[in-house]
UniProtKB/Swiss-Prot annotation:
Residues 80-175 form the Toprim domain. It comes from Streptococcus pneumoniae (strain ATCC BAA-255 / R6). GO terms for molecular function: DNA binding; zinc ion binding. May play a role in DNA repair. It seems to be involved in an RecBC-independent recombinational process of DNA repair. It may act with RecF and RecO. Plays no role in chromosomal or plasmid transformation but is required for resolution of chromosome dimers occurring as intermediates in the formation of merodiploids by transformation. Keywords: DNA damage, DNA recombination, DNA repair, Metal-binding, Zinc, Zinc-finger. Disruption phenotype: Mutant is sensitive to the alkylating agent methyl methanesulfonate and the DNA cross-linking agent mitomycin C. The gene is recR. A zinc finger (C4-type) spans 57-72. Disulfide bonds: none annotated. This is Recombination protein RecR. The keyword DNA repair applies. The keyword Metal-binding applies. It comes from the Bacteria. CDD domains: TOPRIM_recR.
Length: 198
């Protein structure tokens, strides 16, 4: 169906979001058009504000509005342990269980030979720099239980073990193919408590 240009452009914008197909994009566009002008303005203001005010922590790579982030600057955190994650959303999932008290490092992706993503394409160099200048004795690899997550964890293990750093992996309990972001708190707690050395 042909829609007026402003609606078609809005549908196109929504359809660029991950997981949003054309039907959902159309529903969102029409819902947005039906919102009050004040609500649309607030939505637009919040979207622009988030884009403008958020940055990545220069230490851990987590999405934050402070640099360095509040976790990296918290002196009560365990400075000897770093939990390595794929995405900033995974940090929030781990923080929700309130049992991990160490530091984080966000890779912003995983090694994926099939997709042409090499170790140089993810946030590994800053992790190595961090480890050289710190008292870290353990790195917990908390990548998703996928082929790319496994490839990344094995690469980190081979890279860090010769440096005398203990490398562990979250225990199974996370289903193969599952995303950490969507795991419940009990599953995450058991996974971190029962992590295994690589």
């Amino acid at each position: 169906m042909l829609y007026p240009t402003p609606i078609a452009k809005l549908i196109d914008s929504y359809s660029k979001l991950p997981g949003i197909g054309i039907k959902t994009a159309t529903r969102l566009a029409f819902y947005t058009i039906g919102m009050s002008a004040d609500d649309v303005n607030e939505f637009a203001k919040n979207l622009l504000s988030a884009k403008r005010e958020l940055t990545y922590c220069s230490i851990c790579g987590r999405l934050t509005d402070d640099d360095p982030c509040s976790i990296c600057t918290d002196p009560t955190r365990d400075q000897t342990t770093i939990l390595v994650l794929e995405d900033s959303r995974d940090v929030a999932a781990m923080e929700n269980i309130q049992e991990y008290h160490g530091l984080y490092h966000v890779l912003h992706g995983l090694i994926s030979p099939m997709n042409g993503i090499s170790p140089d394409d993810i946030n590994l160099k800053s992790l190595m720099t961090r480890l050289m200048d710190s008292e870290v004795s353990e790195v917990i690899v908390a990548t998703n239980a996928t082929a790319d997550g496994e490839a990344t964890s094995m690469y980190l293990s081979r890279l860090l073990k010769p440096a005398g750093i203990k490398v562990t992996r979250l225990a199974r309990g996370l289903a193969v193919g599952a995303d950490i972001e969507y795991a419940d708190e009990v599953t995450l707690l058991r996974a971190i408590e029962n992590r295994t050395e690589l």
